[in-house]
Swiss-Prot record:
GO biological process annotation, one example: DNA-templated transcription
Reactions this protein catalyses: RNA(n) + a ribonucleoside 5'-triphosphate = RNA(n+1) + diphosphate
Family, per entry: Belongs to the RNA polymerase beta chain family.
Protein task: DNA-dependent RNA polymerase catalyzes the transcription of DNA into RNA using the four ribonucleoside triphosphates as substrates.
InterPro entries named in the record: DNA-dir_RNA_pol_bsu_external_1, DNA-dir_RNA_pol_su2, DNA-dir_RNAP_su2_dom, DNA-dir_RNAP_su2_hyb_sf, RNA_pol_bsu_bac, RNA_pol_bsu_CS, RNA_pol_bsu_protrusion, RNA_pol_Rpb2_2
One Pfam family per UniProt: RNA_pol_Rpb2_7
Keywords: DNA-directed RNA polymerase, Nucleotidyltransferase, Transcription, Transferase
Keyword Transferase: yes
Name of the molecule in the record: DNA-directed RNA polymerase subunit beta
Any GO CC annotation of this UniProt entry: DNA-directed RNA polymerase complex
Domain of life assignment: Bacteria
A GO MF term: DNA binding
EC numbers: 2.7.7.6
Amino acid sequence: MAYRNVKYGKKVERRNYSKIIYDVDLPNLIEIQNKSFNWFLKDGIEELLQDFCPIESYNGDLKIYFGECYSTGPKYSVEESKTKDASYVIQLFVKATLENTLTGETKKSSVLLTELPLITDTGTFIINGKERVAVSQIVRSSSVYYSSTFDVKLNKNLYSGQVIPARGAWIEYEEGSKEILYVKLDRSKKIPLSNFIYALGFNNREIIEKVFGKSPLLNSSFVKEEDMDTGNALIELYSKIRQGEKVPVDTARDFIRKRLFDQKKYDLTTVGRYKFNKKLDVLARAEKTYLVHDFVNLETKEIILPKHTFLTKDKIEILRKNRHFLLQELFDAQHNLENETDEEILTYKKDPQSRELYIKTNILNFRTGEIIFPKDTLVTDEVIKRLRKSIQLLDGKVIEFFLRSKDVYQKDLERTGVFNEILEVYLSKDEHDNLQHKVQIVGNNQKETKKHITLSDIIASISYYLNLYEGIGNVDDIDHLGNRRLRLIGELLKNQFRIGLTRAEKHIKDMISVSKFSEVGPGELVNFGFLNGVIKTFFANSRLSQFMDQINPLAELTQKRRVSALGVGGINRDRAGVEVRDVHNSHYGRLCPIETPEGPSIGLIASLAIYAKVDDYGFIQTPFFKVFVQNGASYVSNQIEYLTADQEKEEIIASSGYELNSDATFQKDKVIARKNGEIGIYPKEQVTYADISPKQIVSIATASIPFLEHNDSSRALMGSNMQRQAVPLLVTESPIVGTGIEYRAAKDSGSLIIASQPGIVTYVDAKKIVTSDQEGNKKEYQLTTFEKSNQDTLILQKPIVSLGDNIQKGDILVDGPSTNQGELALGRNILVAFMTWEGYNYEDAIIISEELVKNDVYTSVHINKYSVQTRELKKGSGKEEITREVPNVGADAIKNLDERGIIIPGSEVKEGDILVGKITPQGNVDPTPQEKLIQIVIGEKAREYKDSSLRVPYGEGGIVQSVQYFSRKNGDILPPGVNENIRVFIAKKRKISEGDKMAGRHGNKGVISRILPKEDLPFMEDGTTIDVMLNPLGVPSRMNIGQILEIHLGMSAKNLNIKVATPVFDGVNDQDLKEISQEANLELDGKKVLYDGRTGEPYENRISVGVMYMIKLSHMVDDKLHARNVGPYTLVTQQPMRGKIREGGQRYGEMENWAVHAHGAAYTLQEFLTIKSDDIIGRNQTYSAIVQGKQLPKPNIPESFRVLIKELQALGLYVELIKTDTKENEVNKSLIDYKKEGYN
């Protein structure tokens, strides 16, 4: 038989039906976030601080430098932070140096940077005692993008381009009318492309044509050519950006230079530079073209490739190795727009190879005209020091160049020319020697590492745009994962730090500009309060910082692997189209095509696929087996390589259904494989990679659905989403029919305790486990017992190891909520029959056995927290007190309170019971002596205090599980004005009942409609009664046939007393199912004769019966069932409040109105719309009439109509409301007026 027995952990063995040869272990499922946070802590912060370094005063006298960062450990442990409602944070410090540039003196000290929340081992943050998760954001990568649209009128493709940085100005190219190409800089008005090229420094048309070639479209873009040069072009570009403002050439040049090439304003980031170099590489465009000229080694004059060579991949590699011969200098350092203008450059080199710099012009005392340093003076440290001492006498340009920001030598090194790689090609063989048809391909300088855009990049991006019209280059698919990347927690925090530091920089600059070096140090000048505020706001309010979904381990794990396109810098949910939401072929093995929300966020929130990793640039990778050819045979090796979507493009990858021989060679000569996202059939010799596993396409939640391949995609989506809503049960049970990932999902979720070192268990109880290694080193593990989760469910860890057990590093030591023997256990294995029963399971309703209720099969425990605080009241009013002496209540109400007035743990409480007795002073708390005497004699404390006790809210109750008491007297840290804080935790057992929602793993959800006694239930020939009856009509239309296969396999496995693993796309097939059914002595159709429990007669037809794994969802009737007799009304509309928590009414909507109309219940309808809703006068009159036994009055004007009138009056409209009998205008009549007229 096609299976093997596999052990999962030390406790569970499953019969695994997987067919693949190599069973690759899953990577750590939550390491992505921790790795990113650790990078930020180690390198990211210091990198960022260097971008802001130094901060100098406005006159340049003082500078602050930031050095090494270090941190101090968290004040509280993870558990203490949760208990005390504190944040789990570290304090970050930075070593700061204050320098006096005039004297060279320095002062050093450490400065508090911020309090930074620290990530826990399980990938969460604790903010104010609550666990939160930072969700990764998927965004468009900074790069150069080109797109095309087909113009029906012109019958041709129109191209557009965008140069997009992480921060800074965008450059956009587009084609306008009359075939003129235009450019927009930073979303400004457009200018002709030719003018933009002039502005870059090209002074005449001949030079432009020499670089870009004789492109017809570029020629048509030359407008107003006769008076156009670099200066005029710069002025025009400045005018477009600044909305018509006119300035001199130098000002315009400096403005454009700072807008595009200033590192503080323009940032590509490392990934942006990588993408720019990859996109603008001249060799990436040159493939499948012909060389115009011989490609020559300029040093030896040897011909590397002769002219007319057809550039194949091999020839491109030869060019790549000799690419330095493609470089041409387009501008020297003096004419490079990136560099500062001539007037600002006060140095030059006598020898270009030397490091020596000389002053270019005389440096004068601008007050007297006296020469301080003549030209040709060698620039030394002594010269710089003398200049600093004479700073009051120097011209602003001299100060700017010699004494501000960067070192003068560094400035000179940065003054470089513009180099581009240029290649001339023909598109076809027929065009050889026809110079009119040659195409110029200009690429950027591939050695460039700058984090901002360069002139070389801009020139290359223009060339790429022109090449598109000539048939060279490719347009980009923005939804391809090669162009989208993840911002992990490290990068998200770095962006927040940048915002905070930008705000702090201005404040620090203002401070040091008004301070004297002798009077202050770095500690007094540097204040990073802005940074602290930004970090707190991010963790508390950002869409990417989410309250942790702790209801079960799968929900926890899925949230940590979630990917969101929403949030700051992401996509707006309201404007997102179909394309960005849709499944893309590049998602294969990277993002799950199934798991996504069903509402307005569909497609914008996704989950990482099961094997997916993230590279250093943030691109999602997926693993493949490398395929080798040896002795003429292609074989799949066990060598694993992780590829991004871009790297995968040109590879031919065998899809996961390939069949292998025992020596790992392909069985068939042709293999189904993918190339560029398209599926085709390829000879096995051409295949370069093979899928690592059939399940690599889906996420963890989706991979836990057995027989996924037999379900409709929308039902699979519901199945994966509903598993995350499973409530932890009192008694857990792992599925008989699993998929093999239950163990790993539970282990990596963070809800279990994993052994951190090998050893032998020396002590075990319900609260701790102690292990000892060979050297005698002890390790203690504290268990979590009876704690409340974020979703108010019970967290209880139970040991699964015994005294003397030998454990290894990585072993699971305990079971937590929804786990069993270290495996994920969200529900229970129950006996299911697909049959109808008196119509009670119509429309997905579910009938269950009373035995499930009696035996606590689906019983769950829920814990609610209630808290109360005592405060100092305003001056002279006293303070609130916790006491047992609550006024105006009987002895029965306080019988379960201790001497302090706090409920005793273990007490059973119901709605309205006092949990904490509290009194609040009211009125005058300083009575006269006579009043004091009366109070002492009579004991009337009730008159001066009111009862403000904490009571069990409406609809709640249970057993008091624990009480926490915090007091300022005991040294606990409490908010200002709070003296005491008491928390009461109430646990409640919820048995399954009518109205609760249940589901299988195949999207087969339903609500319990009837709980039948055991004696009424259908039973099998051996007397076994059915646990659950499901409607068979729920299967064909939903097309989730997986549930039928599951019950057949489950029944066989239960009879054989085994557990089964059937991995998705690679599990039990038709033949396997037949064989295991025969092994279990079951009928091949999986049907049985059932007998009616009421009559004992057999049903007419045989019925499908089997074992299905069903879960109880968090949508429980106890949370939703609600009725209202009387209750509060909203103040404005006077209609009943909404919601159970406010004791609100049920919504009476349009459809309910139609139903009452149809029944002809006129008076009921009138009452619904008037006296039972918002007719204030009418409801008072009705109350009086009922009490006095009179006839009910006619309704009056509803309050909502009065609200409408007030809104019309607020618009300035004159409204009259004339009463027919009195002819009075009642529009402004108040309720008081009505009372005076006799309405009660």
